[in-house]
Amino acid sequence: MSIKYSNKINKIRTFALSLVFIGLFIAYLGVFFRENIIIMTTFMMVGFLAVIASTVVYFWIGMLSTKTVQIICPSCDKPTKMLGRVDACMHCNQPLTMDRNLEGKEFDEKYNKKSYKA
């Protein structure tokens, strides 16, 4: 079974989307505690904070996305954005690198760490 690669921007967007649903679910749980106003308010506030956190994450990844390098994927010929030295295509999940020293090597996320020396 091969490893499934995923684009970093898509991973962060998926995390932000999951924060929205988790926040709504937590806030909805507060409805079951209508008798105790403190618990109900706590659940609703925590859910609201999760939704606000997702907004912050979406804003952050949007700003980060404007600074990324756009390249054309050699496999699907579609434009994709790269974060770091290695990343995956947003459309076909093809492993990509712009570092000549890493061409032909096995795809690994550790190449993006500052402590890694090629």
Swiss-Prot record:
GO cellular component: plasma membrane
Chief localization: membrane
Transmembrane segment boundaries: 12-32, 43-63
Superkingdom of the organism of origin: Bacteria
Subcellular location: Cell membrane
Keywords: Cell membrane, Membrane, Transmembrane, Transmembrane helix
Membrane topology recorded in Swiss-Prot or TrEMBL: Multi-pass membrane protein
HAMAP family: UPF0295
Protein family (similarity comment): Belongs to the UPF0295 family.
Protein name: UPF0295 protein BCE33L0445
Taxonomic source organism: Bacillus cereus (strain ZK / E33L)
